[in-house]
Amino acid sequence: MWKQILSKLPNKKSSKHEHRGREHGGHSSSSSHTSGASTSKSTDNGAAKSHAKNASPAGKSAASDSGFKDGNLKSSGNNNNNNNNGVFTPYEALPSFKDVPNTEKQNLFIKKLNLCRVVFDFTDPTKNIKEKDIKRQTLLELVDYVNSPNGKFSEVGIQEVVRMVSANIFRTLNPQPRENKVIDALDLEEEEPSMDLAWPHLQLVYELFLRFVASPETDTKLAKRYIDQSFVLRLLDLFDSEDPRERDCLKTILHRIYGKFMVHRPFIRKSINNIFYRFVFETEKHNGIAEFLEILGSIINGFALPLKDEHKVFLVRVLIPLHKPKCLQMYHQQLSYCITQFVEKDCKLADTVIRGLLKYWPVTNSSKEVMFLNELEEVLEATQPPEFQRCMVPLFRQIARCLNSLHFQVAERALFLWNNNHIENLIMQNRKVILPIIFPALERNAQKHWNQAVHSLTLNVRKIFHDLDPELFKECLAKFKEDESKAAETEAKREATWKRLEELGVRKAS
């Protein structure tokens, strides 16, 4: 009996060893055979074992068996498991889809996806030219395959698409160093964007993924297991890429994911909000704010009425504070569209928006002030009289300051508000409140503004008020002259007081 038990022990070890061998890339017998062949060609045991592992054929796990790690391993000459050209072996083109029967196309699709998980180093254009071309041609074939009707994608196919895309696009972004994180929009505009050297491959990977997400052959229920929240978060991180081509692709893909995967919609909105919070209140540095706002503009446009409280909170806590950063110019057009969409959907929000603009109104940045005036006109165009009346006093105090600005573009843009018929009607309906607020600014411009265009526009606005309500105009003019006279008297008294103090100081000194 003891002999029988003891006789079984070696077999268990052998079985365990064989099982372990399978875990590491094949049967133990084939592994030892390959290792022996490699050892005869190389004196380095480590390199031989690595070579044996990396020689496994393509298949569902071909990329992992070949030592390729998703998104982490670039093809360079620094690894033990490559040949003299600095390429992982083997890396050869697979047959074309048209050269295999329909029953084999799914398997070939997966093999080609695994082949494309290898990430090449594009910093040296002379390295791996042949292999880079093989990958490019394979990606082109995959794009055509995904775009053509070949039946529903299997779960394995979906998983491998996501793995291949992840291996290629998810990487550490290396932004160009800047001395200051907070730099003005002019400097940002003059700086040329940094283009990713790997774009010849990245572009095709993005194109493939876009068509895959949009394809009717992609089962959303299956795909959401792999295009999950973790994947979406990593996708959002890529929006900070300095390459505008990549951000444009990401914008389209994220919009498609938002439309197709309804389960992810709240998570996507919340994650974008968090990026905005960090941008506004911490870094003031992000390359993808305009693209995010463009996506949100489309989303806001589809909001059902009445608006949910969640969406109103988003307007107040996220969109309005986005007027604060110095680099507003880089995304103002998209932000203004989002803001206007809210007011057009619910005119009662006009008062909230206008007061928000006044809160963040620039004091020392004239070009930013012009942008605020442009946006203000769009908001006022969608504003109804009740909402206008609630905010007109603080609003026209600010407009009066703009009218008196020595920066002619600010004063000119403020005067252009009277060219809008809807805004002019709102002003004239409430002229008894508005004219006394802005009359001093109009009169000073008419008397002594240095810019001829501003002077002419001011006279036109004065004439509009005079023709519509001459009595009110006379009252305002009389009040202005009285205030100016009092101000002159106060100034004269102040000067006389200072003069007496100076004389007193001279007497004491002598």
UniProtKB/Swiss-Prot annotation:
Residues 1-87 are annotated as: Disordered. It comes from the Eukaryota. GO terms for biological process: brassinosteroid mediated signaling pathway; defense response. Keywords: Brassinosteroid signaling pathway, Cytoplasm, Nucleus, Plant defense. GO terms for cellular component: cytoplasm; nucleolus; protein phosphatase type 2A complex. Residues 27-42 have a biased composition (Low complexity). Disruption phenotype: Delayed flowering. Induction: Induced by epibrassinolide. The keyword Transmembrane helix does not apply. The keyword Cytoplasm applies. GO terms for molecular function: protein phosphatase regulator activity. Residues 10-19 have a biased composition (Basic residues). It is found in: Nucleus, Nucleolus; Cytoplasm. SUPFAM superfamilies: ARM repeat. The B regulatory subunit may modulate substrate selectivity and catalytic activity, and may also direct the localization of the catalytic enzyme to a particular subcellular compartment. The holoenzyme composed of PP2AA1, PP2A4 and B'ETA acts as negative regulator of plant innate immunity by controlling BAK1 phosphorylation state and activation in surface-localized immune receptor complexes. Required for the formation of the PP2A holoenzyme that negatively regulates brassinosteroid signaling by dephosphorylating and inactivating BRI1 in the cytoplasm. PP2A consists of a common heteromeric enzyme, composed of a catalytic subunit (subunits C), a constant regulatory subunit (subunit A), and a variety of regulatory subunits such as subunits B (the R2/B/PR55/B55, R3/B''/PR72/PR130/PR59 and R5/B'/B56 families). Interacts with BZR1. Interacts with BRI1. Belongs to the phosphatase 2A regulatory subunit B56 family. This is Serine/threonine protein phosphatase 2A 59 kDa regulatory subunit B' eta isoform. It comes from Arabidopsis thaliana.
